[in-house]
A protein has these predicted regions:
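Positively charged n-region of N-terminal signal peptides that target proteins for export
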Residues: 2-11
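Hydrophobic, small-residue-rich alpha-helical packing segments that form membrane-like cores
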Residues: 196-198, 214-215, 219, 229-240, ...
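A common structural junction motif
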Residues: 184-192, 283-290, 402-413, 637-647, ...
Length: 972
């Protein structure tokens, strides 16, 4: 249940971009229905029978903006609590549970009025005692178990500034059960295990604060939205989290979770006419209530230029904020367009050119419109001079950004750029309409911001009508106005570490409510399995080592083309830097093309191209207008064969070197990168990607000719060509043949790479001390057996039982019962090729002072797995739906085919697995556990604060602790 803190700006930007590019084409809005129930609930239905399942959401127009200022975090905490059930769901005996629940509410009232620390601690202890008694009559995991019982997947929720959403996917034949369950959760909810869940919220809080970008965004938002609820974290202030008010939570629910403030959204494979009476029968039961008047916040002061500075970043950056507009303003769409003239996915924006010209390292621009206010945000990271190993100054970087903005203000606007951005908007909508999740997000946005869907679906014409005069008017109005500028220097933010609470875990019995039994009697439809049909993929070979796959696109005019060369950084380490150069380089020749000119030419053709690399593959991804396929492919071919890596004063090459120097300076400060490097070391030893990579000195000594040589070496390898588009396969192949780099006698690929792994042949504990971490990270590793597709269902069944989301043992024992973690998991990885060794990977993210206890609990699950045979029916249902709904989009269909072929499948595995799942018994899971997990050596990796982790307890239980140092994990 993520709270969107770090990525709020990105999410708003993506939604804004989606809304900018909407267009009506035949069939795109077919099956869309919107209406209201008598109680005021909005219903939005969109049939899409190309999908294998249904996306079901409930949306409430209430977020952190609606919280009392003295009780921040309520909206997000309520999101957590709405998974705990009702007076019927999740209770084994409501008559016995109810007085205990009401006692807990009263105790929290007393706690809120108590200031003496000792008295507060005594009340917290009392709350824990009563909560433990209450837990004897509850089953807090019942809601997730019920979702599992209908084959539901992706159970989740999120809270933003303006809304709270709950969602999961499910098979269409289970529609009535899903509607019943999602409506019942809103009738008399019970916020049981309030104290325990608060600890999980704290763990979520800890997780975000270990990322410096969270601190940067909070600092920027705090000033951009000063005096407004948007200025604070969605998760709430720590002082409010420490002083929770259960009654305020109940009041918040009663106030905002009313039908007139909510929407039900269904998108996917269902019949809307059949759904309507079921919706009336279920959601029609919700009682209508009036909505209160929402608080009116004052406008943040933008009357003068202001500057702010802080040492918070992994790297220096400048951010510039202007006053924007709220959602629905007449200029919202125009500002989306204007900011895309500065930065866009085609890399042809004015700020993008600064990156391509190596004047800055990174640059961005976004229009962040929200319900109440909006901001325009620009930013850049200075160029890093590899020769001096110094960043350019922030003032110099700021000046570069402002100079580009001034071009818009003065009307110095390239009409080709405007045309390219317009085309990007149109294409982006066509692409997003391929995904049911994005259709849901469109409907969600329509409801939350009260914008009629009909208007949103007419915005193509509005985009087409934007003129140069409109752009200049908006640029003058918004960019010539006062701004707030932020100079972010490198630094280490202060962290507020919270002590482990003195509470005992909940010990609920394993049981089911009467509701569960009645739920099983609700009628369902009939499962009609639909398997993947690969017969529409045209498979051919240009040469022995050059394989081409063509998949039809019947939805739009945008093709996608992936070139997948069978070599990566494992065999050619310097290919990482050659790939980076490709993304900022031009084309040799007379006259040739600069990087900006190359991308501008692609944009004129309605196309974009990106290069990437993994340890196994060098990838070229091209996307564009079908009618220009030949010209686009020819242009990319020219770039691949004749890239111009040289530049005046080697600024391009120095930019790549500077980026690598900057990254290596940052990596020991970034807890996620440190954890990844430590995990790589535990798994691969000296074969860790962080150890076997080129040294920094080797990178700094690179030449452009060396990188060009490494690139062309990669182009000699075996090649897969994956095309998805509307043109006939024969025509496509005639276009591609001879117009792409392909070797007649290609080097055979060894990919996907199977790196030699460090064996786990004895119990071992690794410890990486890091006193800066807000949240410790604990990993578990067990060697498995050579993988066979004959065992695929057994692997899936064990993974679902042991680590399957909210219903799995790991989350239930560690999060639900003991509140030790926000995130915890455990599963066997599936290798990409049969015969390669599997591995069990487990994880717990928790406060350092909880680590020793968390390790004990996790190890107890590995040593003596609890057995609940009654769960097998849910597991069968879940797995059956999982394999049936695991269908690729048409753009990824041919790559799914090749990956299945590598595993040894000739058809959709679901055709075999559905029958195997039906025969599955709990004894199969138990036998798998005993042969693959129980008694096996376990490697444990702990990363966290050495002052808070109880190393004595860990050593006493698991033996010698091997300490690691960061210097050992990274090569320099």
């Amino acid at each position: 249940m993520p709270v969107y803190i770090r990525y709020m700006r990105k999410i708003f930007t993506c939604i804004a971009l989606l809304l900018c590019i909407l267009q009506v084409q035949a069939g795109q809005s077919n099956g869309l229905t919107e209406y209201k129930l008598d109680n005021g609930l909005t219903v939005m239905l969109w049939e899409d029978h190309d999908q294998p399942d249904v996306q079901g959401w409930t949306v409430t127009r209430a977020g952190s903006i609606d919280e009392p200022e003295t009780a921040t975090g309520l909206a997000h905490y309520l999101e957590h609590m709405l998974f705990k059930g009702t007076d019927r769901i999740g209770t084994l005996d409501w008559e016995k549970e109810r007085p205990l629940y009401e006692h807990v509410i009263a105790l929290y009232d007393t706690l809120a009025m108590t200031e003496d620390p000792k008295s507060r601690e005594a009340i917290q202890t009392r709350i824990n005692k009563v909560s433990r008694e209450e837990a004897l009559y509850s089953a807090t995991d019942e809601f997730s178990n019920l979702i599992q019982s209908i084959g539901g997947e992706g159970l989740n929720a999120f809270t933003s500034y303006d809304e709270t959403c709950f969602m999961n996917s499910f098979p269409g034949y289970q529609l009535e059960r899903w509607l019943t369950l999602y409506s019942d959760r809103l009738i008399h909810p019970v916020f049981r295990s309030f104290q325990a869940e608060l600890e999980n919220v704290f763990e979520e809080y800890n997780m975000y604060l270990d990322d410096n970008s969270t601190h940067v965004q909070n600092f920027v938002n705090g000033h951009l939205y000063a005096g407004h609820a948007y200025a604070r974290d969605i998760i709430g202030y720590p002082e409010d989290l420490k002083n929770p008010k259960l009654r305020r939570l109940i009041e918040f629910y009663d106030t905002w979770y009313v039908p007139d403030n909510m929407a039900l959204i269904l998108v996917g494979d269902f019949n809307a006419e059949e759904a309507k009476p079921l919706i009336e029968k279920t959601f029609g039961r919700l009682q209508a209530k009036p909505l209160p008047v929402r608080k009116v916040y004052p406008q943040t002061d933008f009357s003068k230029d202001e500057r702010f500075a802080a040492k918070l970043g992994y790297m220096p950056m400048v951010e510039i904020g202007y006053k924007g507009v709220p959602v629905g303003d007449k200029d919202e769409l125009l500002l989306d367009f204007v900011t895309s003239l500065l930065s866009n996915s085609m890399q042809v924006g004015l700020l993008d050119k600064l990156v391509l010209d190596s004047k800055v390292m990174y640059a961005w621009a976004s229009n962040d419109s929200r319900r109440d206010q909006g901001r325009i945000e620009l930013g850049a990271v200075p160029y890093m001079d590899a020769a001096t190993q110094q960043y350019h100054s922030l003032p110099e970087t700021e000046e570069l950004v402002i100079n580009e903005v001034e071009k818009l203000v003065k009307g110095d606007i390239d009409t080709a750029l405007v045309a390219a951005v317009r085309e990007e908007f149109y294409q982006q909508f066509d692409r997003t309409m391929e995904y049911p999740q994005m259709k849901v997000r469109l409907l969600e946005h329509s409801f939350v911001y009260q914008q009629p869907i009909e208007e949103l679906l007419q915005q193509k014409e509005q985009v087409a009508a934007i003129t140069l005069a409109d752009i200049q008017r908006a640029a003058k109005q918004y960019f010539a106005a006062p701004r707030k500028t932020f100079e972010i220097a490198e630094g280490n933010p202060k962290k507020n570490k919270l002590p482990k609470p003195k509470i005992l875990p909940l010990t609920p019995p394993k049981g089911e409510s009467d509701y569960y039994a009645r739920f099983d009697t609700i009628p369902t439809g009939h499962l009609v399995p639909k398997f993947i049909n690969f017969s529409d993929i045209d498979q051919d070979n240009f040469y022995e080592g050059v394989h081409v796959y063509c998949t039809p696109n019947t939805q739009n005019h945008i093709f996608s083309l992936r070139l997948k060369y069978g070599v990566g950084t494992y065999e050619i380490p310097m290919l990482e830097y050659a790939t980076a150069m490709m993304n900022i380089s031009g084309v040799k020749g007379d006259p040739g093309m600069t990087s900006a000119e190359f991308r501008a030419r692609l944009a004129q053709l309605g196309a974009k191209c990106t290069y990437s690399v993994t340890d196994s593959y060098f990838l070229v991804d091209i996307e564009g207008d079908e009618q220009n396929l030949q010209e686009i492919v020819s242009l990319v071919n020219l770039h691949l064969l004749f890239p111009n890596f040289s530049s005046e004063n080697d600024v391009l090459l120095n930019n790549i070197k500077g980026q690598e120097y900057s990254m290596r300076q940052m990596e020991q400060k970034n807890t996620d990168m440190v954890a990844d490097a430590a995990m790589e070391y535990m798994r691969y030893g000296e074969n860790s990607a962080y150890i076997r990579r080129p040294t920094l000195q080797d990178v700094l000594e690179l030449t452009d000719t060396q990188l060009e040589s490494e690139l062309h070496r990669a182009l000699d390898y075996e090649l897969e060509i994956h095309y998805a588009g509307a043109l006939p396969a024969m025509e496509v192949k005639s276009v591609l043949y001879g117009r792409l780099p392909m070797a007649e006698h290609a080097r055979p690929t060894q990919s996907p790479i199977d790196r030699p792994q460090k064996p786990v042949d004895k119990d071992v504990v690794y410890f990486l001390p890091d006193a800066t971490m807000q949240q410790a990270k604990v990993y578990f590793l067990i060697d498995g057996e050579p993988y066979s597709i004959n065992d695929a269902v057994r692997y899936m069944a064990f993974n679902e039982y042991f680590g399957g989301g909210f219903s799995g043992l790991v989350m239930n024992e560690i999060r639900e019962k003991r509140s030790m973690a926000y995130t915890a998991y455990g599963y066997f990885e599936r290798p990409p090729v049969q015969g390669r060794t599997t591995r069990f990977v487990g994880y717990v993210g928790t406060q350092s002072d909880k680590v020793a206890d968390a390790v004990d609990v996790y190890m107890s699950l590995l040593d003596s797995m609890p057995e609940y045979p009654a769960t097998i029916e849910n597991i069968r249902t879940m797995l059956r739906q999982s394999v049936l709904s695991n269908k690729p989009t048409f753009r990824k269909k041919s790559e799914r085919l090749t990956s299945l072929m590598r595993l040894g499948y000739a058809i959709d595995p679901a055709t075999l697995q559905v029958r195997q799942i039906q025969r599955l018994r709990f004894d199969d899971i138990d036998a798998f556990y005993r042969s693959h997990v129980q008694g096996k050596p376990v490697a444990i990796l702990i990363i966290g604060d050495p002052k808070l982790i109880d190393q004595k307890q860990i050593k006493a239980h698991y033996g010698k602790i091997t300490k690691l140092s960061k210097n050992k994990l990274f090569s320099y």
